[in-house]
């Protein structure tokens, strides 16, 4: 086996590193997952709630295998991967574009693309199966010493079909890893009731999913971060806190054990641990969150115009049915942008591109954001995701609808889905010959 042969533990062990990152080890073989250990993500929108333990970072470096669930930066963070070397083995789902795989090969030649249903052997009594989910995400089923661990990370289970599909793959589940708070920022500052509703709905759905999957132990994770900039900090006002989350889930599922782990904590996969110490540490961290100062370069109109023109050209080039969609959606393919740092207003559509505008009627579709956020929206492959998830913007309902329509091309193209005749035909055939999968080809 390539990689570090001398790892720190022989008996089965779980070390919680931070957010969605943990290290599983067994018989001197270790598997790390989704390392985000420092820095801001989603165009400088989120930061970690708690500091990563330095010893955990050292253990990450020594991991034999590192699995990434998907390409979002709180799971696959290029700037954090500098801690790894050619001695590490990387694991990722099989994809068409191979973006992640090609990036990882610059660090190590030991990159394994895991196809659906293939069980990858990590070591003795230690395997991982990667299950793609919807368009971009994936979950993992880990077998370790006759225990089954299901890591759902960000997979948003929406219906019974998906639950049944997953349960058929896993069989009885010993340990379930799940996200527990909202990870989206499309809510204006004065819409606190909306955010409260999100939080309640997340807990109710999570509880329902737990009842169906019926694991012995649940570890809520992948939500230990916060909205950290001045233009999205208000988004923290209704997020689910770990102590209240476990309190609610425990009442709804009294026969299931719920475990809270703090960065650096270790667990032998069997022992009963008290959550009190971890709760106290997280509550102290919640109290300390604050806006992180960040110098952001302003982008002048000429550069924004060039970025918008390139965005239009790329959209039309990659989607040969663009003009068909544009004909039927002209009124939704336009939006006004209020640039908060430049104190200027602009109008955008696919015909004129970006042009200077006067005052904006509140009944028109609008979105307020910084010039840098707008530039990132036009230029980044997942600029739309970064904006919607990061929450560094506000808009009216019409504006949000326009954002969804205008940038759906970009978002889907990043997932290798294109609006062209081949795609329409493929989707038509899929409806005729229904497949029983929970993911789209990627």
Pin down the residues of each PLM region.
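Feature captures hydrophobic
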Residues: 267-442
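Conserved beta-strand hairpin/beta-sheet module of binuclear metal-dependent hydrolase folds
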Residues: 10-56, 137-153
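Metallo-beta-lactamase
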Residues: 90-147, 247
């Amino acid at each position: 086996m390539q990689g570090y042969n001398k790892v720190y533990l022989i008996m089965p062990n779980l070390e919680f590193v931070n957010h969605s990152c943990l290290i599983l080890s067994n018989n001197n073989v270790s598997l790390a997952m989704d390392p985000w250990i420092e820095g801001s993500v989603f165009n400088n929108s989120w930061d970690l709630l708690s500091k990563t333990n330095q010893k955990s970072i050292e253990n990450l470096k020594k991991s034999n295998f590192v699995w990434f669930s998907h390409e979002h930066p709180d799971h696959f963070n290029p700037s954090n991967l500098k801690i790894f070397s050619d001695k590490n083995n990387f694991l990722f789902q099989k994809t068409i574009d191979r973006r992640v795989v090609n990036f990882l090969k610059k660090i190590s030649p030991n990159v394994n693309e895991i196809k659906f249903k293939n069980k990858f052997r990590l070591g003795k009594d230690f395997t991982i199966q990667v299950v793609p989910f919807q368009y971009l995400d994936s979950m993992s089923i880990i077998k370790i010493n006759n225990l089954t661990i299901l890591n759902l990370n960000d997979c948003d289970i929406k219906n019974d079909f998906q639950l049944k599909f997953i349960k058929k793959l896993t069989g009885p589940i010993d340990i379930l890893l799940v996200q527990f708070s909202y990870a989206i920022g499309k809510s204006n500052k004065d819409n606190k009731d909306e955010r409260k509703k999100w939080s309640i709905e997340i807990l109710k759905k999570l509880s329902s999913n737990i009842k169906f999957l019926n694991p012995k132990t649940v570890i809520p994770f992948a939500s230990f971060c916060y909205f950290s900039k001045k233009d999205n900090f208000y988004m923290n006002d209704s997020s689910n806190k770990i102590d209240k989350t476990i309190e609610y889930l425990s009442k709804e599922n009294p026969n299931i054990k719920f475990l809270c782990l703090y960065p650096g904590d270790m667990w032998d996969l069997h022992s009963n641990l008290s959550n009190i110490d971890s709760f106290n540490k997280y509550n102290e961290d919640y109290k300390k969150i604050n806006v992180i100062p960040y110098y952001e370069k302003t982008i002048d109109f000429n550069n924004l115009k060039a970025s918008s023109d390139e965005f239009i050209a790329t959209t039309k080039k990659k989607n040969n049915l663009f003009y068909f969609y544009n004909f039927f959606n002209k009124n939704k393919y336009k939006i006004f942008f209020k640039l908060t740092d430049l104190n200027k207003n602009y109008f955008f559509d696919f015909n004129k591109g970006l042009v200077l505008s006067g005052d904006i009627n509140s009944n028109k579709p609008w979105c307020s954001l910084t010039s840098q956020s707008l530039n990132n929206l036009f230029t980044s492959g997942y600029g739309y995701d970064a904006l919607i998830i990061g929450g560094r913007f506000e808009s009216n309902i019409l504006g949000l609808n326009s954002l969804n329509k205008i940038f759906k091309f970009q978002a889907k193209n990043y997932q290798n889905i294109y609006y062209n005749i081949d795609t329409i035909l493929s989707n038509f055939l899929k409806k005729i010959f229904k497949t029983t999968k929970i993911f789209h080809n990627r």
